[in-house]
């Protein structure tokens, strides 16, 4: 699973994301957090997605989705199928 897979899954479901922040640890690891919106006109976030990955190949090493409504963790995703299931449940 890569960052491209994440963006593609979100777009297919019809949500919009904006990159909130990105931290590069300098050793090849990066942590990104995305704010998930229902549409481009929406200002209220549905969820926050944290993805940890290596810059080479952007292979995901950790992925979690936190619901904005109550800040509970939706799922720690190990596969793109887990991630898509979580997004559809929002």
Name what the model sees in each region.
Residues 1-40, 74, 80:
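Negatively charged, low-complexity tracts enriched in Asp/Glu with abundant Ser/Thr
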Residues 5, 82-89:
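Long, highly charged amphipathic alpha-helices
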Residues 13, 17, 56, 87-90:
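Short, flexible helical or helix-coil boundary motifs
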Residues 43-85:
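Intrinsically disordered, low-complexity regulatory segments enriched in Ser/Thr/Pro
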């Amino acid at each position: 699973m890569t960052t491209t897979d994440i963006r593609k899954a979100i777009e297919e479901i019809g949500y919009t994301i904006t990159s909130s922040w990105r931290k590069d640890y300098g050793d090849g690891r990066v942590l990104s957090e995305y704010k998930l919106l229902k549409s481009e006109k929406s200002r209220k976030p549905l969820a926050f997605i944290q993805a940890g990955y290596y810059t080479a190949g952007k292979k995901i090493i950790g992925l979690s989705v936190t619901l904005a409504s109550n800040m509970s963790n939706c799922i720690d995703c190990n596969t793109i199928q887990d991630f898509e299931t979580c997004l559809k449940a929002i």
